[in-house]
Swiss-Prot record:
Usually encoded in the trnK tRNA gene intron. Probably assists in splicing its own and other chloroplast group II introns. InterPro entries: Domain_X, Maturase_MatK, Maturase_MatK_N. Belongs to the intron maturase 2 family. MatK subfamily. Pfam families: Intron_maturas2, MatK_N. This is Maturase K. The lineage of its organism: Eukaryota, Viridiplantae, Streptophyta, Embryophyta, Tracheophyta. It is found in: Plastid, Chloroplast. One of its GO terms (molecular function) is RNA binding. Keywords: Chloroplast, mRNA processing, Plastid, RNA-binding, tRNA processing. The keyword Plastid applies. It comes from Abrus precatorius (Indian licorice). The gene is matK. GO terms for biological process: mRNA processing; RNA splicing; tRNA processing. One of its GO terms (cellular component) is chloroplast.
Amino acid sequence: MEEYQVYLELNRSRHQDFLYPLIFREYIYGLTYGHDLNRSIFIENVGYDNKSSLLIVKRLITRMYQQSQLIISTNDSNKNLFWGYNNNIYSQIISEGFVVVVEIPFSLQFSSSLEGAEIVKFYKNLRSIHSIFPFFEDKLIYFNYESDIRIPYPIHLEILVQILRYWMKDVSFFHLLRFFFFYYCNWNSLITPKKLISTFSKSNPRFFLFLYNLYVWEHESIFLFLRNKSSHLRLESFCVFFERIFFYAKIEHLVQVIAKDFSYTLSFFKDPFIHYVRYQEKSILVSRNTPLLMNKWKYYFIHLWQCHFDVWSQPGTIHINQLSEHSFHFLDYFLNLQLNLSVVRSQMLQNSFLMEIVMKKLDTRVPIILLIRSLVKAKFCNVLGHPLSKSVWADLSDFDIIDRFLRICRNFSHYYNGSSKKKNLYRIKYILRLSCIKTLARKHKSTVRAFLKRLDSEKLLEEFFTEEEDIFSLIFPRTSSTLQRLYRGRIWYLDILFSHDPDLVNHS
């Protein structure tokens, strides 16, 4: 990365946005694959160690032109990729090198934006993924409506090229990008767009995430601009990206463009309280609006997707619910607004009266039904939640059996420690503990009761019960009230956003 930075810094005055020459640098592909390209992929190039090989990349592009547009059969896809039998290998090599190149200006822009006097200016645009947790802790006192929004995807690939043009001015670079998209779409001409994106995300996930981040940033930049114009609340950080790729200058461009294009639209969204948070493709919009204004926001999103991104989205993709009567699902938690009624006696001079105060709190709960279904699927319990022995693990050693159950139990505990009520979490732990004991008893061909009498059961179960307590006992005394309060309260582990996996049973 330092070599690329030096390359761009030396040419910043004349070629700041020109990345096309980097496509023909062999070390780009060596960095992508973790080894020298000509030693491992093209046998005929053994011993060729030139650092700037124009021949290799030109040969790749030429072979892409010469390939048939027919879809590769299943038998061909199983052949060795590095011997030329799979036609898609050429486009895949170039695309993986392309994403390394295209990320360079954004990385440099991020580092240069934090230098000198501009640090305050750009610091305001930083959006942390950890803002999801303050949303979970928010009491939502002034909010009464919630909208579940699922951002539609995929969009037309040409739209992504146009979005990327705001950032770079290299015409040759975009011609190559269009050619790659055109080749890939024609090669998969018999596949639906949804299936195409699914295949693309598996073949080159890094490139897919970059394009998806670019699309989501464009979508949220427009929304956040309108939100700032129509809301009096301080904007907290809500723009979230998988790889935490931040883009900044687009906001300044939107201020000039959208202020002109949406001058009449803003009058329809005079909403002083809007709360917005997103993770992956799902976002939550919470507001104090009336149903009429919430429907206006709903159709604003639909028109934005259809007119600006050419994505057809049905109105049913956005669901509007009243917070006090509906629970919604976000980040594998069930969220609902809990109302706590308090009666306060007040006295003024000789008159006294009672006041009812309603306090709101966003309640985060463990989705017990979904988790039990997951345990049933993995055969840890039956549909009623009764623990079962894991027969396929009966041939393992005692240490491996206990370690596997501990790992699964730790995953649940780590992910759902932010729940406001731990009863359901303790139930899941109980199922796993008893399933572990039944598995060990089955291995030793004994009943559970006889096995517990013969084995030191307290030492076995101690691993499960003291997991969280041991962590906090290193900070607070074991008899401290602070430890007890933390153990019962909500604890958020920040890394659950990066290791997010709904199937926690198989996630280790």
